[in-house]
Amino acid sequence: MLNNSPLYLKQDMVIRDEEYCRKNGLMGMSDTQLKAYPNAWRSWPRNYGGNYGDNSDIPLWNGLARSLNTIAIRVGDLVGASNIFNFVYNTLQLNTLDPVNDVGLAQMVMGSQTHGVTPTALAAAFQIFYDGQYTTPHLYTRVLDRDGNIYLENNSTSYQALTPDTAYVMNRLLKNVLYSSVGTAGGRYPNSNGMEAFGKTGTASDEKDLWFVGGTPYYVTAVWWGYDAPYDMTKTLGKQQAKTRTCVMAWKALMEQVQADLPYKAFPTSAGVVERRYCTQSGLLAGGSCTSTAVGYYRADDLPGTCNYSHAAAPAAAAPAETAAPEQAVIPADTGNLDTD
């Protein structure tokens, strides 16, 4: 059971109910006292704030926008922890990950890794949600001597990490974090000549590490907020303030400054992706009896079926209320490119 609750720290271990263990044959009177984590047999994962959800159906765009751990773990379980690890380690070059200890859902989905990743590596990884291309990160291109001769040259490499179809669908999914009313960074997109953006928030369970990765048609930026000596930032900020007034606001201010004089640019679309209205109750393409619909983005060769339900019950998840741009609720991207085993 402990293996299903992987996020406990060793210092959290306490002695549990020995009488219960003895009655159930788990230990004898002469056994050394057993130790287990608090609530070791609880359900896992929990969402930020400690809840497990309400057992209602939630479309993927909503779970991602709200940063629900339960939805993320479910998707990660479908893809497979080893497939995710192989993709991010080999294709996205996140080489600070541990091939022995970091192949698991807690590590790959929740970020509970042995050493973690750097902001540079994280920004490089998120660049694939522009057009699917990955370029090795570098801090300079070339160094010239006083005569104009090349003294140093950084030869970065580029390759296709995702198909353009998958990259565009993921781009639309991540846009909801900033533009949907339920997004963890809802309304905090840069005001940059009408250019769109995408992003993802991240918060450690002890509020000692805050993250935001944001992308625009020009830049991808990763922001980490914390202390060299880890400190619980909710001691000076509330939980919501820690999430919404730190990384994402710093990123928003930076993007508005660096993009102030840049001409308008749009994210590239993909000819293999189509827009369709879908039923927010069933997740299927909207049928004639669907009363609550939203726009989804789908691979043209992988459309879901059409909904034919009567919809007598209340909606499972309402259509997203946008904070600015038109609604952009989307369905999962193709995960076939992650199958690198």
Residue map of PLM features:
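A penicillin-recognizing enzyme superfamily signal
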Residues: 3-12, 62-66, 115-322
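Mid-domain, small-residue-enriched loop/turn segments at the edges of structured enzyme/sensor domains
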Residues: 29-47, 80-124, 137
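Conserved catalytic neighborhood of penicillin-recognizing serine enzymes
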Residues: 2-84, 146-176
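Long, low-complexity, intrinsically disordered segments
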Residues: 325-341
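Thr-Gly-centered strand-to-loop micro-motif
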Residues: 74-75, 111-112, 199-200
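C-terminal catalytic domains of large/alpha subunits in multi-subunit enzymes
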Residues: 75-78, 86, 93, 281-285, ...
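Extended, hydrophobic alpha-helical segments in both membrane/secreted and soluble proteins
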Residues: 1-3, 23, 71-72, 84, ...
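Periplasmic/cell-envelope proteins involved in peptidoglycan metabolism and beta-lactam response
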Residues: 4-13, 82-89, 105, 253, ...
